[in-house]
Curated annotation (Swiss-Prot):
GO cellular component terms given for this protein: Golgi membrane
Protein name: Carbohydrate sulfotransferase 3
Cytoplasmic side: 1-20
Its biological purpose: Sulfotransferase that utilizes 3'-phospho-5'-adenylyl sulfate (PAPS) as sulfonate donor to catalyze the transfer of sulfate to position 6 of the N-acetylgalactosamine (GalNAc) residue of chondroitin. Chondroitin sulfate constitutes the predominant proteoglycan present in cartilage and is distributed on the surfaces of many cells and extracellular matrices. Catalyzes with a lower efficiency the sulfation of Gal residues of keratan sulfate, another glycosaminoglycan. Can also catalyze the sulfation of the Gal residues in sialyl N-acetyllactosamine (sialyl LacNAc) oligosaccharides.
Superkingdom field: Eukaryota
Enzyme class: transferase
Primary location recorded for the protein, binned into one broad class: Golgi
Alphabetized GO MF terms: chondroitin 6-sulfotransferase activity; N-acetylglucosamine 6-O-sulfotransferase activity
Post-translational modification: N-glycosylated.
EC numbers: 2.8.2.17, 2.8.2.21
Binding residues for 3'-phosphoadenylyl sulfate: 141-147, 301-309
Gene that encodes the chain: CHST3
């Protein structure tokens, strides 16, 4: 038998041992690799899980992500593939949600911050808080406010109130002195705010006699507000029920305050005229109230014309003036009468100066209008006022203006709103004694200069139609 080459026993043992060790080494390397892979996988799962756990439940609800995709019932982690899928889905929906909410990515957010900073450095623009406007026609008696108020009363989508603060003046009394004006202004302002919010019930505390079951026959000048005399506010007429201030063109039952408040809320806009708001600064809380979008139109008129009109309309209050005019002697007018006239002019002037200074809270919310400009161009001024208020002017209002400003004769009564406006506004010049005009010019000089009313040097200039007592003014009246 042939003998082959054989390795020594020691070598064979060594080779066999090496093979066995190699197998164990390979197995050990495999185990280490698997262990490292599992550890990495666990770390990834842990990070994803932590991310998911940190997301508020509200966001999951907001973007309709199923919570079951995030955590299992037993709070254990799902497989990596399921978690990756859930996390990707959630991330996508969060992105969509952020876009819907106006939240931009970091770079876009930084751009927005720069844009906001740029806007803050720009002058404030006219307020555009919302579609509903709250227009206040701020005036004094005998300035033509009833006539100008009709520009808003005749528009069907505006709820208009005529002098609602009249009831407060008749009911609330204040101590005489300097606090009187401030105290009354605060009450007027607070009532005004509630009225703009269509809380007409606030008037029930001031109407005399007190309304019963929200019904009253004593709403001041109800007939001057179309909104209070149209359906459904105009309820069936009740026989033998006397209504002091009744509707003009139809017969209605007592005013139902609840129905009036509901009608106010249904209208697109709200407007009212008030001759008892004297200090513009008291309206700042209303201008800053987020529930309101206030527009103030201050109506002024030549103080000489105002006094001439008041002496006719309120003759009983001006007996002292008439006696002074009729007195051929040298006795002067009582100083307290002149001081009262001067105080009225100054309060009007100070409010106008505040509005024209354009403080931030009033910017875009104030307009100064001269009655003389309205009388000379009523349709043009109506369009300007509506543009300022942010309300479209309807043909209905334009037709009313055309018909009621070109009448052959002024309407009857001292409160008539039917006028030949282009001729009417200067009638006072031919009936006022020059010495009365001199008193007004001396007491109201600063206000007259601000509003562009020229002084009459003598009686001839006062009655000369070819001599204008009105300066032409530009568009600076709107701020």
């Amino acid at each position: 038998m042939e003998k082959g080459l054989t390795l020594p026993q020691d070598c064979r043992d060594f080779v066999h041992s090496l093979k066995m060790r190699s197998k164990y080494a390979l197995f050990l390397v495999f185990v280490v690799i698997v262990f490292v892979f599992i550890e990495k996988e666990n770390k990834i799962i842990s990070r994803v899980s932590d991310k998911l756990k940190q997301i508020p439940q509200a966001l999951a609800d907001a973007n309709s992500t199923d919570p079951a995709l995030i955590l299992a019932e037993n709070a254990s982690l799902l497989s990596l593939s399921e978690l990756d899928s859930a996390f990707s889905q959630l991330q996508s929906r969060l992105r969509n949600l952020s876009l819907q909410l106006g939240v931009e990515p970091a770079m876009e957010a930084a751009g927005e911050e720069e844009e906001e900073q740029r806007k803050e450095e720009e002058p404030p623009r006219p307020a555009v808080a919302g579609p509903r406007r709250h227009v206040l026609l701020m005036a004094t008696t005998r300035t033509g406010s009833s006539f100008v108020g009709e520009f808003f009363n005749q528009q069907g989508n505006i709820f208009y109130l005529f002098e609602p603060l009249w009831h407060i003046e008749r009911t609330v009394s204040f101590e005489p002195g300097g606090a009187n004006a401030a105290g009354s202004a605060l009450v007027y302002r607070d009532v005004l705010k509630q009225l703009f919010l269509c809380d007409l019930y606030v008037l029930e505390h001031f109407i005399t006699p007190l309304p019963e079951d929200h019904l009253t026959q004593f709403m001041f000048r109800r007939g001057s507000s179309r909104s209070l005399c149209e359906d459904p506010v105009c309820t069936p007429f009740v026989k033998k029920v006397f209504e002091k201030y009744h509707c003009k063109n139809r017969r209605c039952g007592p005013l139902n305050v609840t129905l009036a408040a509901e009608a106010c809320r249904r209208k697109e806009h709200m407007a009212l005229k008030a001759v008892r708001i004297r200090q513009l600064e008291f309206l700042q809380p209303l201008a800053e109230d987020p529930r309101l979008d206030l527009r103030v139109i201050q109506l002024v008129r030549d103080p000489r014309a105002v006094l001439a009109s008041r002496m006719v309309a309120f003759a009983g209050k001006y007996k002292t003036w008439k006696k002074w005019l009729d007195d051929e002697g040298q006795d002067g007018l009582r100083e307290e009468e002149v001081q009262r006239l001067r105080g009225n002019c100054e309060s009007i002037r100070l409010s106008a100066e505040l509005g024209l200074r354009q403080p931030a809270w009033l910017r875009g919310r104030y307009m100064l209008v001269r009655y003389e400009d309205v009388a000379r161009g009523p349709l043009q001024k109506a369009r300007e006022m509506y543009r300022f208020a942010g309300i479209p002017l309807t043909p209905q209002v334009e037709d009313w203006i055309q018909k009621n400003t070109q009448a052959a004769h002024d309407g009857s009564g001292i409160y008539s709103t039917q006028k030949n406006s282009s001729e009417q506004f200067e009638k006072w010049r031919f009936s006022m004694p020059f010495k009365l005009a001199q008193v007004v010019q001396a007491a109201c000089g600063p206000a007259m200069r601000l509003f562009g009313y020229k002084l009459a040097r003598d009686a001839a200039a006062l009655t000369n139609r070819s001599v204008s007592l009105l300066e032409e003014r530009g568009t600076f009246w709107v701020t």
